[in-house]
Amino acid sequence: MPGKATLFATLLACAALAGCADHKLSEQSLAKAQSEFDQVKEDSDVLRAAPKDVIRAGESLARAERLSSYWGSSSDVIQYAYLSQRYSEIARQHA
């Protein structure tokens, strides 16, 4: 029996560490998306050339932030943060 308890404790610890890694990655993704969005929303050339892409970047970022704060998984947060970054990049390319 002690072997099964030890195995269970080890598996539980691994799952907790994986969850921490996912959370850290989602926080990093959010921070990068926020930085990219801040740059494009402050650039008048980008706002003039690609307003819809800037709006989409902001909407995707807002969704990622909502998901991170209460009910989304880390993969959901990472996905919407990625979309926000891509829309920011697309907007910048149009300027």
Language model features: what each stretch is:
Residues 10, 67:
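Short, flexible active-site loop motifs that bind/organize anionic cofactors or intermediates
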Residues 21-66:
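Amphipathic, heptad-repeat alpha-helical segments
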